[in-house]
């Protein structure tokens, strides 16, 4: 690790939160530097993501659990900058999930897939202004969306209209069936 990266990693490990509190307690009880403890845990997680049973679940919990928690905290905070950061993450996460759905059948056979996926998601949620989500959104998703926005709006509006028509039709048919059923019950009594 370069000196600058090591310093940023060490600063991150000394921020005040529940994980660093746990690291501090572990460091105090064992006498082992929290950097080594964190790197050991990261190494074990990486090995588990390669060889462990349920690696998909663990990867999805990491990619969903922490971001969901900090998204709720962002919503409740008066600062709107963090809202934008996590909305950007969720847009990238959604696009990634759609792409992954179609490629998962092939990618899941790749031995390092879940470790790489987890690394990708951690890069997207990294606590820096130019994290992966921000980069992917600004360079790929936003330009694509702006180029095709009117077409996407048309498709969404058409789908919304068709869904409303279908819901209205189902509702009318359900009412007719209920009236018919009630009418038959009255005749039989």
From Swiss-Prot:
It comes from Bos taurus. GO terms for biological process: endoplasmic reticulum membrane organization. Belongs to the DP1 family. Residues 1-34, 75-84, 124-189 are cytoplasmic. The gene is REEP5. Residues 114-185 are annotated as: Required for dimerization and maintaining endoplasmic reticulum morphology. PANTHER family: HVA22-LIKE PROTEINS, RECEPTOR EXPRESSION-ENHANCING PROTEIN 5. Keywords: Endoplasmic reticulum, Membrane, Sarcoplasmic reticulum, Transmembrane, Transmembrane helix. Plays an essential role in heart function and development by regulating the organization and function of the sarcoplasmic reticulum in cardiomyocytes. It is found in: Endoplasmic reticulum membrane; Sarcoplasmic reticulum membrane. GO terms for cellular component: endoplasmic reticulum tubular network; sarcoplasmic reticulum membrane. It comes from the Eukaryota. It is a multi-pass membrane protein. Monomer (heart, ventricle). Homodimer (atria, kidney, intestine); maybe disulfide-linked. Homotrimer (heart, ventricle, skeletal muscle, liver). Interacts with ATL1. Interacts with ATL2. Interacts with ATL3. Interacts with CKAP4. Interacts with RTN4. Interacts with ZFYVE27. This is Receptor expression-enhancing protein 5. The short lumenal loops between transmembrane domains 1 and 2 and between transmembrane domains 3 and 4 may impart a wedge-like configuration, thus deforming membranes. Pfam families: TB2_DP1_HVA22. The keyword Iron does not apply. The chain crosses the membrane at residues 35-51, 54-74, 85-103, 106-123. Residues 52-53, 104-105 are lumenal. The keyword Heme does not apply.
